[in-house]
């Protein structure tokens, strides 16, 4: 494994660990792994290419909009999700490269 494939700092690793240290956030990552299987079709935005509308994620989780927003922001700030604004809505999709990189780092650390 080359060094550039690993996360650069302990702070970066801790930020990601904190982001995934929640059952709800782990559920979000799991649901977004199969967006077409877990969410209904959207009028604006392709579920795979553009991501899933935050409102559909909130509905799937059965939580308040503010709570969903906080969870999605933590995952996005940690680099595990991409957020895309489109026609007044925010769509989220997984950052597969960052997830793989974190998994490699975790395996290396432990």
Enumerate the predicted regions with their spans.
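Short, charged/polar, Gly/Pro-enriched secondary-structure boundary elements
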Residues: 98-102
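Short, hydrophobic-biased segments on the C-terminal half of alpha helices
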Residues: 72-73
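Beta-hairpin "wing" of winged helix-turn-helix
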Residues: 77-86, 93
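N-terminal leader segment of winged-helix/HTH proteins
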Residues: 1-27, 31, 77-80
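A common structural junction motif
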Residues: 109-110
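N-terminal helix-turn-helix DNA-binding core of bacterial DNA-binding proteins
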Residues: 15-18, 24-64, 90-97
